[in-house]
Structures are given as structure tokens and as C-alpha cells.
């Protein structure tokens, strides 16, 4: 059966159920109630899911009172007779002539020509009515116009239409649908064709009916095998658009075949259509019944007789198309031949007309342009072959611009098109569709018809998936994608379709419950984008199919709760407990966080396979996309632990990242993170990016939020393939997800899926989006959800039975009930203030960080352990030699002390990751952790020699030093994530200058300083921030000590500014060995790197440990007298050396200088004990280089008097004045200010 209905051949059953539901809901299976409550039986004008409420097919209005005209007979003898439509003039009913019945005869003589052996049958019922009507039709003086019409445009457009319907909602459009609609449109131009003749008061009258009622001649087989013909009317056709016309047409045909037509259906036919062409008749002159003005007969579509023996190739070469003969048989009393001829010419024009098919395509929701009628182009086949190749390339490049990827279709007046995708632009026409062209291996063929080429290209690039991949530079990757995209579409199995439907059921049931139970609470629902659940499920399933180890998900807050429940498997009861605000006291350390920021872990088990895979969702803040680099770092850490390499079997932990469309285009960290994708220090073997594109950012429309065509354009920078997919087509989304994983596995690169959908509610559940997007939300408010539209499509295409649909509906209701049942069992906890996390991790007592002198010697030797044929740069070689000397003789500088600390860790089997801009050499040419061959460029890393012991056995240690991209936000986020993923590694990131760390402020605020308190997420990442006032200007001076101290609380991190190489050594050693997982912020020196006073003896490494407060060496060595000190200068960092030089120069025994090496947590007891060593101190000053409103003073000025009120209640500050910038831009001004600080300190 032909039907554009969403339910195809099953539409009648659904509509019958809907009718019963309207009359008595209890008469319909309860599983259908929720589905039918907002069901509209008319077809929508969208695919795959309708927008807005579909318009109902109009019903005939009450007919004005008038006397009936004479009853005409049905077309071609159809029974029962049709009734004339109303007119403005009353026509009195004619009284039938009285007839007297003849007396019965004993036997009737056989008619002439009938022998006694012939079989005779008395015609009764419908057959008798045919005889009567045919006889009556002899009284109608008719004439017939005949016109041969090219059928090619209609044939080709019907192919396009039905291919679209087959892929979307099912059903077919017949030629009679198109022809009937063209007749109705032609009648509007020639209304006289809709008139009929009558006699009123004995006078001839031309009756013009109020409406066009098109009579369809329907051939019906009887139970006895005989055929009968009925003519039923489609009423009020002139008021219908194409979708309504098809619905009314199919309703009449279906009821005729089911024997459910009523007398009203036969009444009022004004013009008829009969199509004997369906049985091969080429030319027909049907009889015209009384009460009608015309009947149109359609013949079979055939090639002209002289070409019917030609081959298909020859016909295509000559440009010969099929013809259809139309006849118009009309009542010559009221219609003239010219009118009938013009009427047929109009139908002819319509069936070739662009606008006619444009309307039909729009009504059926076909998003691209129809086949256009054009004159054949006489160019040679060779010229056209080149154009076909160009056309294929155009579709590969720009096919996505014509893809039907927007489920809302807000602009229904515009076809998705592009000049490059128009065959006419390439000098090709519909006459070329059946011609063969060389295609150079396209779809695995050497030659293909243009029709097949176009069909495959549109299926591949222009349906519900738009693909961008031609920006990829590697031909192998392009070819791999083409081989999988340019193939015949294969539907999922029924089992897979049911599984997809079950995931949609779960997604919608979850959101429905939350909306019902927690009205108005913020949850950032997934409604409108539920397809992301089966999409993610499919991607994870494919990862399991490849035998991978884990999928780690990072995502924003929208849809997060649904993902936690339906992907990660977090129990409903736990999620709803968080909704109730009932935090478990045993877990409520720190501040906690809102429910849609929390993470979880689970295991995914395949539905159609035997594998399982770990799945985790990382915690995130509301700072959109800030989690991106954190996820990548965490995954890299897990991969490094597994250590499966970079080959085909490597990268077995998969990062899956969800984004919003506005954020993906708008947040710079997206580009920063993408830029890391292929760098050796940051590769994770490809990320699966899924953009939940609801086409709005809070209240901002796409045209206000990005300059690019797509939100995904930024991903082209790394050569990632991009798939745009319609979120209302779950099967397409699932197919793309699997392909994305396969591509990632093959090429170890990122893949981007842009799933276009919508947001059913506002940005949050308390927001009203219609204030700013009224048109969009008018569409959304009446749009059926994807679960229902997918169910319709499955039934309409015949993929599942009505019984299976009922089972799916019961599954949905069962899942909803399951959620309701779980929430009744919620565990209740009393609410109490949250406790601090500070005491959760304590420094172990008696921990030693000293090392044996022999180990220091090994590290020194390693710096001269390069191969004999290695060409060390002449400026680097003296540095390496000096380091070996320091390892044996002392006077260790800062850079070598750092390498000694790292070397000892490697010897102890620890993994070290050290990154940053210019980190391997060092911004200040101080580190040289990796040596480059002056001639060949090969690398030598001295510390790698410490990963084996003196006997050559591996220690298990790894040293990974990388120069990072020029990024702070993504780079710091990555290292934080790495430290979370591998808590046993020592992870260091160094800023080029400390000033630039503010580029990573979101990571510092949201993760480093508060991740433990909010999520219980532990990290011991180390930030090294070069800091110090040296006259280099405001942007090369300050690591912003004040900001870190402001963020510090609850022991959230350690903030230090060591002043000696040995103390820095012990600080790093303590951090790596104490078992406390909290970030370490170190403000490192610049000019002090080469200060000859800033060196340490070997015994400081072999006998000491980290000291949070340092006195001057003269006091600790016993040469100074503490009792003489009356003025105590507290300071930190490199300023100490300037103060010490001034003291030494002036011999000021009355001044003592104390260094606070650890700024937070404040070493209160050690500081108090040290101050007690100076019994005669009278004045206390905090001396800093930084302006008064910066550095440590804004915090210490408040804290020191509180913690040590006996001594420091009156502590004063010595510093630069308060400044908005960190320093002066003039080196001369700097020198003056610096001198003033020193002078005031000793005043």
C-alpha cells in the first residue's frame, strides 16, 4: 500500500486504535495510552520527526441546503451512483417515469445471437448498476482531448521521494498521487473543468460546485476472484496541501479495500481520475457520468513505440524518455475543446514544473531540491565524464551542506542546497541519469549510471549524516572513510533496533521521573537530546568489541545525571539521594559539590558480545570545557601505567568527551586541548568528541555565538573527521558512533560527532526560553520526542510489528516504574555542616629525605655518560662537566639540585613527568635535562641512566621530559589530570615565567585548589613558577603569590618559596615520598639561579631535610650571636640574599634575617620556636619585593598576628607601595624601588 504516513501500511491499525482511544481509553491496551495521548493521525511534513502539530486533513463542511441535481452514474459504471455537489441554484428533483410491469411470460425467447448452449448470467448489484450508469452516460455529449506528457521528471522525482521515505518513516508515493494532485492544482486555474450540466425548471444550467471533489476509480478484487470498480470522492481537494491530499487519498483507498466506504464517500464527485495505465493500457477514453464535467484518464508510461526495441544504453544515449498519455473526456455542452486542451497543458506543465515538485518535497520533509526538468545537454560523453568526477568530488567536499541534520527544520521554506551539488551546475541534466560514466573506482566500480552515482552520494553525504573529511591531509585516511561511507545503506538488525529503543526508553524515563518528582530543581536535563544515550552506548560497545581497557568520559553538566544512570551505571537511589540533599556523613568531607558535577565508575557489559570494559566519568566544574585537558591528562596517565606503546595495540584507554555547541566554538581551551592531540608528550591515541548541539547557548543563537558555519570547525586544525548527524535518527547516530571508534582505532586520531538536537526546556528547568527564542520553542513545544518518533518510524517501515511496539512501550513504562520504586527506598541522613579535609592527610613523622653521597655521584657521572659518538654542544659541555664536579665537591647550584632530586626518584623506581614551555633546556638556560647532538639532532637524557641500578637492572623508574605547546590552560589542566590518573608519579609543570600561570587560572581555581574538597579528587601536581623582581617589567616578574595564598584553605595545597638549592631538593623529595596527595606550588628563582651565594654543600643533601624556616648560616653554624638581634626581618625567596649582603656590608649584628620557606600551610610551631631563639628582639618586619597589595603580605599580615600574637601582633610591612601592576616597566625605577626596600629594612 502506498502511504506517506509515519506508520506506512500499519497506519490504519494505529488510527483505528486512536479512534477507539478517543471514544473509550479503556478499550485500548494500557501500554498505548502514553503513546496515543498526544498522537496526531495526520502525516507530518518532517523527517524523521515532525515539527509542530501536524495539520489535520480537512473535513468537508456542511453543504448548503439545495435541491439535489440529477443523480449521475459512477465512472465507468462504478456503483453506487455518485451524487452531484451543491450549487447556488436549486434543481428540482425529476420525477421518474412510471412504468407498468409486463405480464409474466411462461418463457422468454432467447435474444438474437444467443444460442441455447451459451451460458447466461443475470447481472445484479454492482454489475447491474454499471449497466444502468453506462446506459445513462450515453445521454452525455462528450468530447475528448488527448495529450502525451513526458514522464521522466515525474519518474525521477518519485524515485527520490520514495528513497527518502524508505530511509526515514516508510511508505511510498505513487504516480497517481502526483497526477491527482496536479489535476487539483490545474482545476484551480481552469475551474470550468469542475462544472457539470443540469436542467433546472426545464432550463439548461451549468452548475459550479463549491468544492473540488476528486473521484478516484478504484479497482477491487472480490472474494470470488472477480473485479469490481468503485469511484469514491476525496472531498474539498482545493483546500489541501500535498500531505493532506495524500492522507485523504490513502484513507479512501484503504476504506475501499476494507469494504468500509459509506454512501457519503460516493457522493459529490465533481471530476474523476481513472488510471488504467496501471494495468498497461496506454490510451483510454473513459465514459463521463452525469453530474460531472470531466474525467481524466492516465495511460501507461512507455517509451515511444519506435524505441521500444532499443537497449537501455541506446535509449539513454539518445535521451529518450517515457511518455504518459492523458485524456480529458468532458461534457461538451458546458466545456469547450480549448478549455480541455489548456487544462491538459497545465497538467503537463505542472508535472515538469520546478515549483510543483518544490512544494511536494517541502510537504514531505525532503530537505533537498527535486530533479529539475531541463533540455538535454549535447556535450560529448567525455566532457560529461569529467563533470561527473567533479560532481563526486563536490559531494565529498560539500555534501554535508545538503544533509538533513537539523531535527527542528526551523526554516522550512529553504532547501538545503549548494551550487556545487546541483547537477545542472556541472552541465548535467536528468537525461544523463541513465547514462553510464567512468567513476575511477567510486564505490568499488569502474562505471556507474549517474542515477546510481547520485543515489549513493546522497545516501552517503546528504541524508541524516553530513561528513567532513576532505580537510584531512592523509589520503589513506580519506580513502578509509570513503570505503565505509560510500556504500549501500544497511539497516540494523531488529534486535539492534529494539536495543536502541530500549536505551531511548531508559533515557526518557529517567528525565520524565525527575521532571515529575523534582519540579523546578536544576538538573540540566537531556530532553531533546536523548539519542546521546544510545550513541554513547554504541561507542562504548565498539570500544569493548576492540578489546580496549577503559573509556573515560568528560562532559559538562547537561545530561550528566542521565549519563551517570544509563551509561556509567550509578544507582538511581544514589543519584536521588543527592537530589534530596541527603549527603552521607561518612562521605561528606569538604564542601562537596552539586549533583551534576560529580563523577563515578562502572563496568559496561556488551549486549551483543562477550566483552566488558571499565567506564568512568570524571568530576567537572561548571566552567565549560575546563575538564577537557584534565580528561586527556588522566587518560595519558592510565595509558602510561599500562605501557602498551603507541602501536596498533596501544592507547587502550579511550577518552570520550562531550561538549555543548556554543562552548565548543567559544571556549579557547577547546582549541588548546585539540592542539595537544598529536604531540608526543600529550597523545592519547584519539578522543571521541560528541557535541550535544542543541543549537542554542543559554539564550544565545548560533549566529551570535560563532563566525563559522559549524561549531566544529575548530577541530579541522588537527585533521579530525567530523560527522554531523540528526539527533532524531538514533540509527544514524549509533552507526556514526561505531564508525568513529573504528577510525580512532585505525589511525589513533580524534573524531568529532556533532549531534544536532534541541533543548526541550530552558538552560535550566526554571528558565523560560520562549522569551528569547519564541519561534524555536513554538516548534519544540509541539514536537514529539525522539522515543515516540523512532517508534513511529520502526512501525512505518515495517521493521517491528505492533506487538513489538507494545513491548517497547511496556519496557518504557516498566523502567519508569523501576525508578519510582527505587526512590522510595532512599536512605535518609541528618544534615550537618561539612567538615574540613585538612586532617584527612597528615605528614608522616620522622620521614627522611636525605640520600647517600654515592647516589649523588652516580647522578653526576650520568651527565658525562653520553655515547662516544655524541656531539655535545660546545656551550653545554662545560655545564655537564661542572655538574659532575658539583656532585663530588659540593657548591651545588639550583638547577643541579633539582636534577639530583629527580635522579634520586628514578633510582628509587619512581615515574617522573616534567613538562612546560622550554622545560627541557629551561627558560633561563639552566636545566639541560635533555642534551641535543650538535650534528645529528639526536637526544641524550642523562637521568635515563638512573632508571637502571649499578648492576644494570631496571629500577622501574621513568623520566619523561617534554617541551609543551605554548599553552597554560590546557597544559596545566593536562598535568593535573595526569597526576590524578597516576598518583604514584611525580608530575611537574613549569611556567616560562610565573606571570603566565594566570592563563590557567580556571584550572587552579576549579581543580588544583579545590578538587579534593569538592570531589575527593586527589592530586600532587607540582607547579614551578619563576618569580622575582629583577626589572624585567610587569609581565616577567610575579607568579602571583597572593592569589595562591588567597585560594589556600583546608591544607588544599603546599605553597613554598625555598631560598637554597638543598632546601628545594628536600622539598621535592618530601613531596614525592610523604604519601600526601596535594598540589605543590613552588615560586622558583630566576637571577638566583646564577647567584654564587645561592649554593649548597653536599652535607645539606646527605644529612638534612626540608626546613620550613631558615635562619642565617652564621647562627646555625654558631658564629653569630642571636641575643644581639633587636630587629627581626622576616622574608622569603631571593630577597634574602640582597638583605644578607647589606647586613654583611654594614656589620649589623642587631638585625636578624629569617626566611619563611613554606608560606602555606604556615609552619606556626617552627616559626614560633625560631623566634624564641631571639630573646631581645623588639621589632618585627615582613620584608618583600612585591607591592603592598601583592605577594605574601595580604595573607600573612592578617595571619601572623593571629597565630603568634605575643611576638607578631605589631609586625610591620616593608615593600613597594600598593600597585595595580606587579612592577614598574622601567629598570631604573625598579632599581630605585629595590634600594628603598633594602634601606628601609635596615633603617
From Swiss-Prot:
Keyword Signal: no
Pathway: Carbohydrate metabolism; tricarboxylic acid cycle; succinate from 2-oxoglutarate (transferase route): step 1/2; Carbohydrate metabolism; tricarboxylic acid cycle; succinyl-CoA from 2-oxoglutarate (dehydrogenase route): step 1/1
Ligand binding (acetyl-CoA): 1054, 1070, 1105, 1108, 1158, 1165-1166
Ranges where the record places region Succinyltransferase E2: 104-353
InterPro entries linked: 2-oxoacid_DH_actylTfrase, 2-oxogl_dehyd_N, 2oxoglutarate_DH_E1, CAT-like_dom_sf, DH_E1, KGD_C_sf, ODO-1/KGD_C, THDP-binding
Biased composition regions of type Pro residues, renumbered to the chain: 59-71
Positions of region (Disordered): 22-118
Coiled-coil region(s): 799-831
Regulation of protein activity: Alpha-ketoglutarate dehydrogenase and decarboxylase activities are inhibited by unphosphorylated GarA, and allosterically activated by acetyl-CoA, the main substrate of the TCA cycle.
GO annotation, cellular component aspect: cytosol; oxoglutarate dehydrogenase complex
Cofactor names: Mg(2+); thiamine diphosphate
Subunit structure: Homodimer. The 2-oxoglutarate dehydrogenase (ODH) complex contains multiple copies of three enzymatic components: 2-oxoglutarate dehydrogenase (E1), dihydrolipoamide succinyltransferase (E2) and lipoamide dehydrogenase (E3).
Domains as described in the record: Is a fusion protein with two major domains exhibiting structural features of an E1 and E2 protein, and a short sequence stretch of E1 localized at the N-terminus, which is connected by a linker region to the rest of the protein.
Family the UniProt entry places it in: Belongs to the 2-oxoacid dehydrogenase family. Kgd subfamily.
Name of the protein described by the UniProt record: Multifunctional 2-oxoglutarate metabolism enzyme
Organism per entry: Mycolicibacterium vanbaalenii (strain DSM 7251 / JCM 13017 / BCRC 16820 / KCTC 9966 / NRRL B-24157 / PYR-1)
Amino acid at each position: 500500500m502506498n502511504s506517506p504516513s509515519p506508520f506506512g501500511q500499519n497506519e490504519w491499525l494505529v488510527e483505528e486504535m486512536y479512534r477507539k482511544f478517543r471514544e473509550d481509553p479503556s478499550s485500548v491496551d494500557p501500554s498505548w495510552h502514553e503513546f496515543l495521548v498526544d498522537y496526531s493521525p495526520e502525516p507530518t511534513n518532517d523527517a524523521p520527526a515532525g515539527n509542530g502539530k501536524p495539520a489535520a486533513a480537512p473535513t468537508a463542511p456542511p453543504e448548503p441546503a439545495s435541491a439535489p441535481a440529477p443523480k449521475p452514474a459512477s465512472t465507468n459504471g462504478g456503483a453506487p451512483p455518485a451524487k452531484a455537489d451543491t450549487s447556488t441554484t436549486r434543481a428540482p428533483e425529476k420525477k421518474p417515469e412510471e412504468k407498468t410491469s409486463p405480464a409474466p411470460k411462461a418463457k422468454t425467447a432467447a435474444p438474437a445471437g444467443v444460442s441455447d448452449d451459451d451460458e447466461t448470467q443475470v447481472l445484479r448489484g454492482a454489475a447491474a448498476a454499471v449497466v444502468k450508469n453506462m446506459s445513462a452516460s450515453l445521454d452525455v455529449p462528450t468530447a475528448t482531448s488527448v495529450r502525451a506528457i513526458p514522464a521522466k521528471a515525474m519518474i525521477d522525482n518519485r524515485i527520490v521521494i520514495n528513497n527518502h521515505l524508505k530511509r526515514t518513516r516508510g511508505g511510498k508515493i505513487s504516480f497517481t498521487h502526483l497526477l491527482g494532485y496536479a489535476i487539483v492544482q490545474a482545476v484551480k486555474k481552469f475551474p470550468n473543468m469542475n462544472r457539470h450540466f443540469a436542467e433546472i425548471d426545464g432550463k439548461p444550467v451549468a452548475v459550479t460546485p463549491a468544492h473540488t471533489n476528486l473521484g478516484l476509480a478504484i479497482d477491487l478484487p472480490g472474494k470470488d476472484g472477480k473485479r469490481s470498480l468503485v469511484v469514491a470522492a476525496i472531498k474539498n481537494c482545493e483546500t489541501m496541501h500535498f500531505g493532506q491530499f495524500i492522507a485523504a487519498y490513502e484513507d479512501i483507498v484503504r476504506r475501499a479495500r476494507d469494504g468500509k466506504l459509506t454512501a457519503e464517500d460516493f457522493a459529490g464527485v465533481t471530476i474523476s481520475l481513472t488510471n488504467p495505465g496501471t494495468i498497461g493500457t496506454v490510451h483510454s477514453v473513459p465514459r463521463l457520468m452525469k453530474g460531472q464535467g470531466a474525467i481524466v484518464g492516465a495511460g501507461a508510461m512507455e517509451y515511444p513505440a519506435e524505441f521500444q526495441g532499443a537497449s537501455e544504453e541506446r535509449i539513454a544515449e539518445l535521451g529518450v524518455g517515457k511518455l504518459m498519455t492523458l485524456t480529458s473526456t468532458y461534457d461538451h455542452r458546458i466545456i469547450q475543446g480549448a478549455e480541455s486542451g489548456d487544462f491538459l497543458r497545465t497538467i503537463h506543465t505542472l508535472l515538469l514544473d520546478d515549483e510543483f515538485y518544490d512544494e511536494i518535497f517541502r510537504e514531505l520533509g525532503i530537505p533537498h531540491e527535486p530533479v529539475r526538468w531541463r533540455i538535454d545537454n549535447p556535450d560529448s560523453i567525455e566532457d560529461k565524464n569529467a563533470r561527473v568526477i567533479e560532481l563526486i568530488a563536490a559531494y565529498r567536499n560539500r555534501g554535508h551542506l545538503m544533509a538533513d541534520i537539523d531535527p527542528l527544520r526551523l526554516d522550512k521554506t529553504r532547501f538545503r542546497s549548494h551550487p556545487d551539488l546541483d547537477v545542472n551546475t556541472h552541465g548535467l541534466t536528468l537525461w544523463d541519469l541513465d547514462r553510464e560514466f567512468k567513476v575511477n573506482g567510486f564505490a568499488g566500480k569502474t562505471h556507474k549510471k549517474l542515477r546510481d552515482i547520485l543515489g549513493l552520494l546522497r545516501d552517503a553525504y546528504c541524508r541524516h549524516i553530513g561528513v567532513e573529511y576532505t580537510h584531512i591531509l592523509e589520503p589513506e585516511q580519506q580513502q578509509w572513510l570513503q570505503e565505509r561511507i560510500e556504500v549501500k545503506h544497511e539497516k540494523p538488525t531488529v534486535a539492534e533496533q529494539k536495543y536502541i529503543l530500549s536505551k531511548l526508553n531508559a533515557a526518557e524515563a529517567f528525565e520524565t521521573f525527575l521532571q515529575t518528582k523534582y519540579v523546578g530543581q536544576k538538573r540540566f536535563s537531556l530532553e531533546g537530546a536523548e539519542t546521546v544515550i544510545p550513541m554513547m552506548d554504541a561507542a562504548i560497545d565498539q570500544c569493548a568489541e576492540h578489546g580496549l581497557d577503559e573509556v573515560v568520559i568528560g562532559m559538562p553538566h547537561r545530561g550528566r545525571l542521565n549519563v551517570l544512570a544509563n551509561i556509567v551505571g550509578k544507582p538511581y537511589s544514589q543519584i536521588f539521594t543527592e537530589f534530596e540533599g541527603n549527603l552521607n556523613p561518612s562521605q561528606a568531607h569538604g564542601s562537596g559539590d552539586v549533583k551534576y558535577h560529580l563523577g563515578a565508575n562502572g563496568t559496561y557489559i556488551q549486549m551483543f558480545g562477550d566483552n566488558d570494559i571499565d567506564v568512568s566519568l570524571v568530576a567537572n566544574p561548571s566552567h565549560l570545557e575546563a575538564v577537557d585537558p584534565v580528561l586527556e591528562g588522566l587518560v595519558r596517565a592510565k595509558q602510561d601505567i599500562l605501557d602498551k606503546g603507541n602501536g596498533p595495540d596501544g592507547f587502550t584507554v579511550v577518552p570520550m568527551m562531550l561538549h555543548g555547541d556554543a562552548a565548543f566554538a567559544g571556549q579557547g581551551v577547546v582549541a588548546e586541548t585539540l592542539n595537544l592531540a598529536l604531540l608526543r608528550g600529550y597523545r592519547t591515541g584519539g578522543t571521541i568528541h560528541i557535541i550535544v548541539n542543541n543549537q542554542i547557548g543559554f539564550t544565545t543563537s548560533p549566529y551570535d555565538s560563532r563566525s563559522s558555519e559549524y561549531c566544529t570547525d575548530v577541530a579541522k586544525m588537527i585533521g579530525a573527521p567530523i560527522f554531523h548527524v540528526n539527533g532524531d535518527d538514533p540509527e544514524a547516530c549509533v552507526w556514526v558512533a561505531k564508525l568513529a571508534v573504528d577510525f580512532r582505532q585505525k589511525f589513533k586520531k580524534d573524531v568529532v560527532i556533532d549531534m544536532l538536537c534541541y533543548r526541550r526546556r530552558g538552560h535550566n528547568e526554571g528558565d523560560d526560553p520562549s522569551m528569547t527564542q519564541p519561534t524555536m520553542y513554538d516548534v519544540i513545544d509541539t514536537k514529539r520526542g525522539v522515543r515516540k518518533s523512532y517508534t513511529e518510524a520502526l512501525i512505518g517501515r515495517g521493521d517491528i510489528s505492533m506487538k513489538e511496539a507494545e513491548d517497547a512501550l511496556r519496557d518504557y513504562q516498566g523502567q519508569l516504574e523501576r525508578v519510582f520504586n527505587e526512590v522510595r527506598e532512599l536512605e535518609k541522613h541528618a544534615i550537618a555542616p561539612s567538615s574540613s579535609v585538612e586532617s584527612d592527610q597528615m605528614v608522616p613523622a620522622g620521614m627522611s629525605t636525605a640520600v647517600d653521597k654515592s647516589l649523588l655521584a652516580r647522578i653526576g657521572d650520568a651527565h658525562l655518560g653520553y655515547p662516544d659518538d655524541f656531539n655535545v654542544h660546545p656551550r653545554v659541555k662545560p655545564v655537564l662537566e661542572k655538574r659532575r664536579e658539583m656532585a663530588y665537591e659540593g657548591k651545588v647550584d639550583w638547577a643541579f639540585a633539582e636534577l639530583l632530586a629527580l635522579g634520586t626518584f628514578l633510582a628509587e623506581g619512581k615515574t617522573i613527568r616534567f613538562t612546560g614551555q622550554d622545560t627541557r633546556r629551561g627558560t633561563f638556560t639552566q636545566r639541560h635535562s635533555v642534551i641535543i647532538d650538535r650534528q645529528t639532532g639526536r637526544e641524550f637524557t642523562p637521568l635515563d641512566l638512573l632508571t637502571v641500578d649499578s648492576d644494570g637492572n631496571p629500577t622501574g623508574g621513568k623520566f619523561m621530559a617534554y617541551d609543551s605547546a605554548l599553552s597554560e590552560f590546557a597544559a596545566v589542566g593536562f598535568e593535573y589530570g595526569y597526576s590524578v590518573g597516576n598518583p604514584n608519579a611525580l608530575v611537574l609543570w613549569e611556567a616560562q615565567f610565573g606571570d603566565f600561570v594566570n592563563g590557567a587560572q580556571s584550572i587552579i581555581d576549579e581543580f588544583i585548589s579545590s578538587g579534593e574538597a569538592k570531589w575527593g579528587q586527589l592530586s600532587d601536581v607540582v607547579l614551578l613558577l619563576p618569580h622575582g623582581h629583577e626589572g624585567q617589567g610587569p609581565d616577567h616578574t610575579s607568579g602571583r603569590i597572593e592569589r595562591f595564598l588567597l585560594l589556600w584553605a583546608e591544607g588544599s595545597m603546599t605553597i613554598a618559596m625555598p631560598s637554597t638549592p638543598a632546601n628545594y631538593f628536600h622539598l621535592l623529595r618530601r613531596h614525592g615520598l610523604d604519601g600526601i596527595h596535594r598540589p605543590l606550588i613552588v615560586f622558583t628563582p630566576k637571577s638566583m639561579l646564577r647567584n654564587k651565594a645561592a649554593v649548597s654543600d653536599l652535607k645539606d643533601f646527605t644529612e638534612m631535610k626540608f626546613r620550613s624556616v631558615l635562619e642565617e648560616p652564621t647562627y646555625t653554624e654558631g658564629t653569630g650571636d642571636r641575643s644581639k638581634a633587636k630587629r627581626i626581618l622576616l622574608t622569603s625567596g631571593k630577597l634574602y640574599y640582597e638583605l644578607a649582603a647589606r647586613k654583611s656590608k654594614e656589620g649589623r649584628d642587631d638585625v636578624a634575617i629569617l626566611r619563611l620557606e613554606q608560606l602555606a600551610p604556615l609552619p606556626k610551631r617552627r616559626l614560633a620556636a625560631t623566634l624564641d631563639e631571639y630573646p631581645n628582639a623588639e621589632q618585627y618586619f615582613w620584608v618583600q619585593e612585591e607591592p603592598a597589595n601583592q605577594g605574601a603580605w595580604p595573607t600573612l599580615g592578617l595571619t601572623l598576628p593571629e597565630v603568634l600574637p605575643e611576638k607578631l601582633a605589631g609586625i610591620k610591612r616593608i615593600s613597594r607601595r600598593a600597585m595595580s601592576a606587579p612592577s614598574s616597566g622601567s629598570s631604573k625605577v625598579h632599581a630605585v624601588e629595590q634600594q628603598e626596600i633594602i634601606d628601609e629594612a635596615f633603617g
